[in-house]
From Swiss-Prot:
GO terms for molecular function: ATP binding; proton-transporting ATP synthase activity, rotational mechanism. It comes from Thermotoga maritima (strain ATCC 43589 / DSM 3109 / JCM 10099 / NBRC 100826 / MSB8). Gene3D superfamilies: F0F1 ATP synthase delta/epsilon subunit, N-terminal. GO terms for biological process: proton motive force-driven ATP synthesis. It holds the Pfam family ATP-synt_DE_N. This is ATP synthase epsilon chain.
Amino acid sequence: MKVKIVTPYGIVYDRESDFISFRTVEGSMGILPRRAPIVTQLSVCDVKIKSGDDEYHLKVAGGFLLCDGKDVIIITEEAGREEDISPDRFMEARERVERVRRFFQSSL
């Protein structure tokens, strides 16, 4: 399956992958190829992606995940390897995600 992670600053990850795991606002989950379609809200979390013998770990500042059964797309304010992310920019993105989450929860 193709996994793509997109931020306002560009595409952070775009590769064929065998497995992806992450944390949603409801708990942790993973996706294998040919999974049933899903749209979910991500928590601030570490995304683990397996591609063959390689394993990638990327931090995401919340966002949304869409899986159509063939491809997985993550849309987030900030993402990258921990050592590459500006802590200030990551915290600002996290705060924006939390404000949006609180707004939508109060609207329900």
